[in-house]
Amino acid sequence: MAKTSTQPVGGWLFKEEPEHYSFTDLERDGDTIWDGVTNNLALKNLREVRSGDKVLFYQTGKDKAVVGEMLVTSDPRSDEKEKDAKLVVVDVRASKRWPRPVTLAEIKADPEFANWDLVKNSRLSVMRVSAKQWQRLVKLSQANP
């Protein structure tokens, strides 16, 4: 039986290149396997994700921004497509697209996020989001730019 979420944080943030797999693709597909994570710290974080956790979808590339929310629908498991046993995947489902994207520039300009991994460790593809940060991001997504 899968463990239920014990997430002590607001949730997680997963990054993806929209040319590879966009939030629109996820909305179309409904759900997908989140794979391709190879960085050791990102893998450590991904192993802590649990079914029921909330995740922000952050698009990288030209228009860096948080664009929507996902729900994790499985606990981490080995990536069956890879020979390296340390690589893990989770299943995710689209939850909702935000009213407007919250750009990296907005995030960097807000002191609330000064110590967040998204600002300090820009290469990290899976990271924690505190409840306070999550609430602030939601407010920003609802504001006029």
Residue ranges and their predicted role:
Residues 36-41, 74-78, 111:
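Short acidic (Asp/Glu) patches
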Residues 65-75:
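Short beta-strand-centered aromatic/proline hotspots
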Residues 1-51, 144-145:
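Compositionally biased, charged N-terminal/linker segments
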Residues 21-24, 64-67, 80:
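Short acidic/glycine-rich loop or secondary-structure boundary segments that cap or lie
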Residues 10, 30, 51-53, 66-68, ...:
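A generic structural signal for short beta-strands and their flanking turns/coil linkers
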Residues 1-18, 79-145:
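Contiguous surface segments at macromolecular interaction interfaces
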Residues 58-64:
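Short, charged beta-turn/beta-strand-edge "cap" motif at the junction between a beta-strand
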Residues 56-57, 71:
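Hydrophobic beta-strand signal
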